[in-house]
From Swiss-Prot:
Record membrane topology: Multi-pass membrane protein
Highest classification ranks of the organism: Eukaryota, Fungi, Dikarya, Ascomycota, Pezizomycotina
Translocase is among the record's keywords: yes
A Gene Ontology term for the protein's cellular component: mitochondrion
Name of this protein: Cytochrome c oxidase subunit 3
Domain of life: Eukaryota
EC number: 7.1.1.9
Topological region Mitochondrial matrix: 1-22, 74-80, 162-164, 231-248
Reaction catalyzed: 4 Fe(II)-[cytochrome c] + O2 + 8 H(+)(in) = 4 Fe(III)-[cytochrome c] + 2 H2O + 4 H(+)(out)
Keywords assigned by UniProt, alphabetized: Membrane, Mitochondrion, Mitochondrion inner membrane, Translocase, Transmembrane, Transmembrane helix
Length: 269
């Protein structure tokens, strides 16, 4: 006869999360990371050591947080259909909030570009600024990023069809293209004739493209975790919320880059 304890069961499909230190840990590390990053730009002595400590702490907290979520969803069965719907809604709302953030960035760019002040020479780009040629490295990066969107879509459809090998190859191709894109973006910054300190043009250019680059790095980590989970047989054809969230996020990154290329690189030059 099985001895069942009523307190071990629940009469609802939702996941009541246990107390976790990782949200607070991650928040503190993010605060230290942004603070030390800002201070390092003002030449505070040895502040970069604290920056690296905060970065290591953030990566460690993310790893441990991912570990707990994977255990809850894959091995403990806490991610029911109701929980999956909630997670999908949370991902969508997060992407909407990010879209509004980029809207503010584009607003700042067009405000400066459409009504250039006397200090900028009453023209855009300002006098003395040589903008990046949109038909060179930016165009190549556009092709690379759009190609990565196609490969991750292929991986998604392969996983739905139960073709694990196709999902692995598609995800690997996407991550490689993302790394190449990030590398080319770094090359573009290193050879640029202007900096973030060169007035409104430099600030808008580097802030918009740099913030997008941060999102590319975050999306790459997102997809790398999903790739490992596919390799470890964690994901199935009907239970892969994390992978779908990473794909939605990646398509959002693609769309934002198209707007950046058209407005900042092409029209803005």
């Amino acid at each position: 006869m099985t001895n069942l304890i009523r307190s071990n069961f629940q009469d609802h499909p939702f996941h009541l999360v246990s107390p976790s230190p990782w949200p607070l840990n991650t928040s503190v590390c993010l605060l230290n990371l942004t603070t030390t990053g800002a201070l390092s730009m003002h030449n505070f002595n040895n502040i970069h050591y604290l920056y690296y400590i905060a970065l290591i702490g953030l990566v460690s907290a993310m790893f441990l947080w991912f570990r707990d979520i994977i255990s809850e969803g894959t091995f403990l069965g806490d991610h029911t259909l109701a929980v999956q719907r909630g997670l999908n809604l949370g991902i969508i709302l997060f992407i909407v909030s990010e879209a509004l953030f980029f809207l503010a960035i584009f607003w700042a760019f067009f405000h400066s570009a459409l009504t250039p002040t006397v200090e900028l020479g009453a023209q855009w780009p300002p006098i003395g600024i040589e903008p990046v040629n949109p038909f060179e490295l930016p165009l190549l990066n556009t092709v690379i990023l759009l190609s990565s969107g196609a490969t991750i879509t292929y991986a998604h459809h392969a996983l739905i069809k139960g073709e694990r090998e196709g999902a692995l190859y598609g995800s690997i191709a996407t991550i490689l293209l993302a790394i190449i894109f990030t590398g080319f973006q770094g090359v573009e910054y290193s050879v640029s004739s202007f900096t973030i300190s060169d007035g409104a043009f430099g600030t808008c250019f580097f802030f918009s493209t740099g913030f997008h680059g941060i999102h590319v790095i975050i999306g790459t980590i997102f997809l790398a975790v999903a790739l490992w989970r596919i390799f470890a047989y964690h994901l199935t054809d009907n239970h892969h919320v994390g992978f779908e969230g990473g794909i939605l996020y990646w398509h959002f990154v693609d769309v934002v880059w198209l707007f950046l290329y058209i407005s900042v690189y092409y029209w803005g030059s």
